Amino acid sequence: SAAPFEMDAAEKTIQLHTLVQEPRKWTAETPELYTLGLELSNPAGLQKDKIETVIGFKKTEIKDGVFYLNGIPLKVNAQNSHMQHPEEGHVMDEATIRKDFELLKQFNFNAVRTSHYPPVNKYLELANEYGLYIIDEVGDEAHASEWISSLPEYEEMYRERCRRMVLRDRNHPCVLFWSAGNESGEGINITHTIEEGKSLDPTRFWMYGGNAFSHPAEDIIGPRYPTPMELEMQVGIGEDSRPSFMDEYLSVAGNAGGALDDYWEAIYRHPRLMGGAIWDFVSPGLTERIRQVDDLSPFHTPAHLMGNARLVKEGKNTVLDLNGHDQWVEVYRADNVELNSNELTLTCRIYPRKLVSSCGSFITKGNYQFGLQQRGKDKLEFYIYTDKKHSVCASLPTDWEYNWHQVTCVYDGQKMSIYIDGAEKASTQASGNIRNFPYPVNIGRNAETHGQETSVYICDAQMDEVGIFAKALTSSFHPEEAALWLDFEQETENGTFYSYGIGARTYGSIWPDRSVQPEMWQMKKTGQPLSFSMSDVTEGVVELWNRNHYTNASRYAIRWELKEDDKVIQSGDLALSTAPLSQELVHIPYKKPALIPGKEYRLMLHAVLKKDELWAKAGHEVAWEELELPWSLPCSSEEKAQGVPSYSLSEKELVVSGDGFKYVFNRTDGQLTSMVIQDMELLESPLRLNLWRAPLANELDNWNASSARSSNWKEGYGYTVATEMYSAGIDRLTHQPLSFSVSETTEGVHIHIIDAELMGKGEKEKKDLYIEGVQNNGIINHYEYIINSEGTIEIRHVLKPEGKMPLWFPRIGLTLTVSDALDQVKWYGRGPQENYPDRKTGYPTGIYASTVQAMYEPYLMPQDYGLRTDVRGLQLTTDKGIGLQFKMNEWFNFNIYPYSTDNLTKAMYTYQLQ
């Protein structure tokens, strides 16, 4: 305690100090906390004031390029996390923070980088309690204005933001080290920020989340977003001697998260590699109402009000009101607006306001296919794309703003014209069919150009009677003749959805409501604190790694199981006391069973908590391993069905039938078009080659597009990773039958089919074919179907690429549409959650059952989902067991959706799935 004192001034500094011997150290594994209190008493000994806070004791060091905590080299498995709530935006209540921390701990994360600002104080208080390392970040992100980090007039602002953070947060033990900010340039003000921070807290180190490989002032370097090889080459064996922490890596926008094992193999190999923070934790969706407006055309195309777009009264009519910000009408990419005609009419009534001169996107389908938009203060542009982009501009009338005008744009196959208030104002020559591109029709926005980096007012206007026609019209616009007709007389609410605004990246490892995305199971597996590997199969010896830094493996109950396929045939418990960061050879007392031909054998190990923790109950699984055992006997040859099914051959079709089945092949197109089992039709569309899947969110982003660019790229398909796939035309295959023959052997009926799948629907011009010297790009398929008397179909499929190919195919396989009644799914493979070839070790092999609808994953932006890998067998059946069974001569992957791939490709929002 301090000696008695008197205060004559408003402030007085009193220094108190004591020696704390051998305190229990705070770590994420052992969040030991102490209460620090301060009492003020008067000379009579009566307490006049008292304050308390929670503190912890820890020490960080860097020795020989390695980061140490309490004398132990530390690996940091982190998530980046915004303060994000689907209802409250950036307001985080305590219950939500606790839920986040429970999920992080349950899925084996030990840290959070608070991107890109200090969190609310409660966040740090709870991190102290739960045991999570915090990389606390100065809120100085400049991003598009990074150059200010070099301007001396901004120095004090950088320093001031640093001071506020460090002075508030430095007594929280959870703060592992500081970050000088995010993407705020590489200038001297970053150095000043770190100088300021170190003057206030000399006990902690600093990193900086810049876009350079490193900053000279930081103690801990990046890089961010390296590949596993780049991480290894640039840092693992690099020359910079500072520890490395990837402040951002593995962008999990939408369906993503591949190669995580590869990163952590490199991290464990090199002591200097501390780990990294995945980008990022909480999906950014905000709850919005689904507000539909009626399309009065015969097609009733789904169209929805976005943002705060409003319907307002204007005289006797109701009109669309847009204020120039993120407000527009989203129209689904239905076939009726995916126009490729040689005629087009766009028409609408417009009441432009002042800000419309900033952009004025009235009716657009991307930046190329077709559109009507204002250019500056005095021009109106109409554009289409046939052999190239054609456009015509008309001068605006002097009374353009704050008056209603009728605008009509017409293309008649020879000429493009703009009409304003019934008078032709401009025209130009153009010809050819309009080319279709993968962007939706928007009213009041351009979906291709107005995304998260929009810097203009996109449409400040009121609009009414918006029409699109696949014919040339200058008057007499009848909704029943339109491809789209919106009169905005009413809106209908149909629930809610998670909005990502005008084009935010749909990052996230958990959904906005805190339910877990499938990638999290891989993250949990890769980051698990125990790992197992087989050392001696014969003796049953397994090597255990305890990757905990401070806790013994004795905190876990460990159970082993010997499985025959999915059946447990032996099991037992293990008592382990492996020290932290140590290995141990463990004997598993299994007995080799009598092997059954065709069965697989594997050893499963499960580690669960023995006691309740703040973040999970006893019994929570923290680690598991699946060790394949090299015990197998080949299947005995199956007794083949005797006899040959009957078949009939007509000019148009081949019918193969037997007891309880009938299959039909169309001889014209060479496809299997019907499968009837027990009088039930199973097929809705033919079996055919599949090279396409709906693009993933990362593939629809321009962020990494340059790495996927090739000579395939064509104008109009955007600037994204998916541009390569769209430009090659693999989403637009044209089926071309080449030959069809039938024969009969003792095996059954043999159907030999050769066909071609041409990429791009013949979109090449003659001059392109001449210059490139390639007549067609596509795949030649050789199919042999062998159908036996039991109705089993053996398919032998060989495909041969011809011509110019894309850099990669998003998928190579077969696809078919089956009856909705076949909604019961059972498979032997990895599961139960969605998994992909580069994200599959976190999903154990087993026999799983689900339904088609239950396998849906609600990514904020619809995309491919639901793959299951390493599949040995698959069944699709009705609830009565009627259906299809699939097997291959090797393990395979499958998806099954209640939606078409075309729907998944074209939908931009979950409410557009149908």
Can you describe what each PLM-predicted range is?
Residues V356, H549-Y556, K804-W808:
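A short beta-turn/strand-edge loop motif at beta-sheet boundaries
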Residues A2-E22, E564-E600, A607, W615:
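Intrinsically disordered, low-complexity Pro/Gly/Ser/Thr-rich segments with frequent PxxP/GP/PP motifs
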Residues W178, V235-L320, Q490-Q583, H587-P589, ...:
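Substrate-binding clefts and catalytic carboxylate motifs of secreted carbohydrate-active enzymes
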Residues F101-L104, A111-I290, A483, D487, ...:
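Substrate-binding/catalytic cleft of secreted carbohydrate-active enzymes
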Residues P23-K25, G37-I188, F245, P695, ...:
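Active-site-adjacent substrate/metal-binding segments within catalytic domains
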Residues T27, P589-G598, E613, L627-Q914:
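Beta-strand/loop-rich accessory regions of lumenal/periplasmic or secreted enzymes
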Residues T30-L33, L38-I51, K592-C635:
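Terminal connector regions
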Residues Q292-T492:
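Extracellular glycan-associated modules
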